[in-house]
Regions:
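Active-site lining segments that contact anionic ligands and/or coordinate catalytic metals
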Residues: 10-14, 67, 94-102, 120, ...
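Short, contiguous acidic/charged loop-to-helix segments that flank catalytic cores in large enzymes
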Residues: 29-41, 57, 86-92, 116-120, ...
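Generic structural signal for hydrophobic core residues of well-folded globular domains
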Residues: 16-22, 73-74, 91, 102-111, ...
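Histidine/acidic-rich helix-loop-helix segments that form or flank divalent-metal centers
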Residues: 58-116
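His-Asp-centered metal-binding catalytic motifs of divalent-metal-dependent phosphohydrolases/nucleases
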Residues: 10-37, 41-49, 53, 60-77, ...
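Charged substrate- and nucleic-acid-binding regions of tRNA-handling and nucleotidyl-transfer enzymes
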Residues: 50-55, 109-183
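Short, small-residue-biased leader/transition segments that mark boundaries at the very start
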Residues: 2-7
C-alpha cells in the first residue's frame, strides 16, 4: 500500500475520530445515582456527522464511510466468530479493519476503568476477524455460494422473493459458515 493509496483512509479515520462523539452532549442523561449515560449517541452522531460533512462538501465516498464508522464506533460484541461475521456484515468488509482501529483508539482515550478487558476483547475480535478472512467465510451476499441466477435456474420466479431468500441464506451462513455451499 503506497502512501498515496493510504491517504484517503487516513482522512476517513481522522474525520471519524473527530466526529465520533459529536452527539454526546445532546444525548446525555443522568440517572438517579448521578451516573451519566449517552444512549444512542452513535446513531445521532452519524446523523450530525453526515450533515457536517455535507455542509463542508466532502465527497460521497468519504461521507458514507465516516458516517458508517461513527454509527458503529461503539458497537460491542463478544469475541466469537459468529458475532464478528455478523458485525462484518453490518459494518462492511472494507470498513471492518478501520472499525477495529477506531475501537482501539477510542478505548485508549477513555478512563483506565476496564481498559485492559476492553483491549483484550478487541484483540480477540481481531483474531476472529483474521481467521474469518483466512477461511474466506461468507459475510456478505456477494460471498454466498448461491446467487439469484442459481435460484432462477432452479425454478424460482424472478422478483423480490429471490432477495428475501438470499438474505435468509446469508443469515444462516453467517451463523453456520459450513452451510455456504451450492447444495
Amino acid at each position: 500500500l503506497s502512501l498515496h493509496d493510504a491517504l484517503p483512509i487516513y482522512k476517513v479515520l481522522r474525520l471519524t475520530m473527530l466526529l465520533h462523539d459529536v452527539a454526546k452532549p445532546q444525548m446525555k442523561t443522568v440517572d438517579a445515582d448521578g451516573v451519566a449515560h449517552f444512549k444512542m449517541h452513535d446513531v445521532k452522531g452519524a446523523e450530525v456527522a453526515k450533515r457536517i460533512l455535507k455542509r463542508l462538501k466532502f465527497d460521497n465516498d468519504t461521507l458514507g464511510k465516516v458516517t458508517k464508522l461513527v454509527q458503529y464506533h461503539d458497537y460491542r460484541m463478544p469475541a466469537q466468530p459468529k458475532n464478528v461475521r455478523r458485525a462484518m456484515n453490518k459494518i462492511g468488509e472494507e470498513l471492518f479493519p478501520y472499525y477495529l482501529e477506531i475501537r482501539k483508539a477510542d478505548t485508549m482515550a477513555q478512563s483506565e476503568y476496564m481498559r485492559e478487558e476492553k483491549l483484550s476483547n478487541i484483540a480477540g475480535i481481531e483474531r476472529c476477524y483474521k481467521e474469518i478472512l483466512k477461511k474466506k467465510e461468507c459475510v456478505s451476499l456477494k460471498m454466498l455460494a448461491v446467487s439469484g441466477s442459481d435460484l432462477i435456474a432452479d425454478g424460482m420466479q424472478p422478483g423480490k422473493q429471490i432477495g428475501a431468500v438470499l438474505q435468509a441464506l446469508l443469515e444462516l451462513v453467517i451463523e453456520q459458515p459450513e452451510y455456504n455451499t451450492k447444495e
